[in-house]
């Protein structure tokens, strides 16, 4: 359930600016997942010296290796700054999980001293109104669907596009996309989802980001989350 929008140039500017402004020599960087973060990972390999990365997915690890960035782990290093994208940025809240990597993305971001987001203008919104991805234990997905619908949402098990069956995350979860329409109280929805038996992690990142780098046609705008 990836969200379309934004040009490659806008994404490149956001990713490169975040690396230039946020990453210092010898830093350990949390490497998010997605098309905008891909530009940041390439910039790390090209511009930053003695930097290592903690990958949030198989894809971000592969991009890091291709870029020449040393890959480490949370067991071996503390994360100085995490750089990640978002499906939506709205008033202190991020929605993530379009790439089905939000479980690892959340705990890497939470472990970092600083968490910055890279995005294009299409991801900005005044209200949280895109479906919220929820990673679930495979056997529990019917329970999660029932509970989400009891909360007033519409829940859909995410199907894979290039194979039969559902999407399976790098951590072995299935993904249920939960549409609540416009969410007036993201904190309450986040708490309700966390309390559902079988939920591994949801894609609402409330109050976690420190800054958002938005790539535009004219340059980069840095804003509060």
Swiss-Prot record:
BP GO terms, sorted: D-ribose metabolic process; pentose-phosphate shunt, non-oxidative branch
EC class (word): isomerase
Entry's EC annotation: 5.3.1.6
GO molecular function: ribose-5-phosphate isomerase activity
Keywords from the UniProt entry: Isomerase
Catalytic activity reported: aldehydo-D-ribose 5-phosphate = D-ribulose 5-phosphate
UniProt binding sites for substrate: 33-36, 84-87, 96-99, 123
Active site feature: 105
Pathway: Carbohydrate degradation; pentose phosphate pathway; D-ribose 5-phosphate from D-ribulose 5-phosphate (non-oxidative stage): step 1/1
InterPro entries linked to this entry: NagB/RpiA_transferase-like, Ribose5P_isomerase_typA_subgr, Ribose5P_isomerase_type_A
Cellular component, GO, one term: cytosol
Main function: Catalyzes the reversible conversion of ribose-5-phosphate to ribulose 5-phosphate.
Family label: Belongs to the ribose 5-phosphate isomerase family.
PANTHER family tied to this protein: RIBOSE-5-PHOSPHATE ISOMERASE (PTHR11934:SF0)
HAMAP family given in the database record: Rib_5P_isom_A (MF_00170)
Complex formation: Homodimer.
Protein name from the UniProt record: Ribose-5-phosphate isomerase A
Protein species of origin: Halobacterium salinarum (strain ATCC 700922 / JCM 11081 / NRC-1) (Halobacterium halobium)
